[in-house]
Amino acid sequence: MKYDLVIFGGGTSGIAAAYTASKLGLNTLLIEATDVLGGAITQGLVVPVMKLNNDGINTDFYSDLLEFSKKYNAQNTFSDGNTGWFNPELLKLVFDDMLKTVNCNVLFSTTPSNITFNEHNDNFTIDLKHKILSLHIETQYIVDATAFGEIFKILNYNFQEKNNLKQACSLRFNISNVNLKIFSAFLMEIDNNREISPIYETKEGIHLSTAYTWDNDKPWALAPLFEQALQNNDLKANDNAYFQLFTVTGMPNTVAINAPRIILDDFEDIQNPFTYSNALIQGRERIYRLFNFCKKYLKGFENSFISHISDTLGVREYCRIKGKYTFTKEDVINPKTFDNIAFACDYPIDIHSNNKKNDELTYLSKTCYVPIQVLICEKNDKLYGIGKILSADFEAHSALRTQMSCFSMGEAAAKDIFNKINN
């Protein structure tokens, strides 16, 4: 079997690339290691999609995603105009529907066992493994959207050098049977800051969010409750590092919790399988403490229960490829002019550190424009790396890694490949 384009990884960037390429008429195959598309959204419970100014650059996929989601009542628009309040379960159906509509080939539970680039034929030969069966395919182009650079590793291409800086991981979870009427009244009583704790009445009910972190840069209304829980030994050290709460579209009386922050020692590498596995165990243990904290300290949670724990660890950064251009912190803060822009972004430099002193949230005064070269392998024009593995330094990566940017990266890569094939 021969394809124009094979994409590995059916997360946010991979889906966007597959959908766009197929819509443009390329013979496209999307390969996903699990049994569901969506990655961080559907398996990691990462909702809502964070709002940013993308300047309308490579946003066609996202516009279509909104239209498909409305068919399933899987999307809502929050009071601040953020259209990214999705239902993570229903998006599993939405993504299938989108790819089926554009006749994209999809293989689930499939992984690469070997990949070779043939310089003479200028294409890739790929051996795939599905359960106990094997497949052999060929393709002109590959897009690595695996989040951990699996294809770059197999082909032995370079990554950015490691340093001691690292992002903390998380393991999200949902709590259901929350009395949102009581909880919203409780929030109104303790927090008059509607930027931190916005509350919004919609036709489907109450939508809200709130937050607390161990940083002292904002007047966190939940701070006294976390401090009391620490004193009472209801929470342990670092359980209070980061806590965000959102209601979920189409899930009445359910809230999504962006916590716990999983703290790794300086010498630990999340790519180590033992470190990764221990992080999951630590995360689930701490989820139960945070759940009991909510039941005891937050009004409206008295009869609640844990309804879903993320199926995958929330890793903000595994590795970063070496592309034809490496985007830097300076490029984010003082934007340059580039040809062939892949996406625009004004999301802050957002570093979730292992300790307070290295946390950073630096808002941008200008929108930065990211060139397609950060998505192309430095040594092979036919290999792209998109999503969380884009070519950037540590600080720039923290601003560029969000889901909205990942959607645009996938779309940009697909369009660039289409143009190369047709020229």
Task: Write out the residue ranges for each language-model feature.
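Conserved N-terminal/central alpha/beta ligand/cofactor-binding core
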Residues: 20, 26-27, 32-114, 168
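Flavin (FAD/FMN)-binding glycine-rich loop and adjacent Rossmann-like elements that form
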Residues: 40, 135, 139-141, 145-422
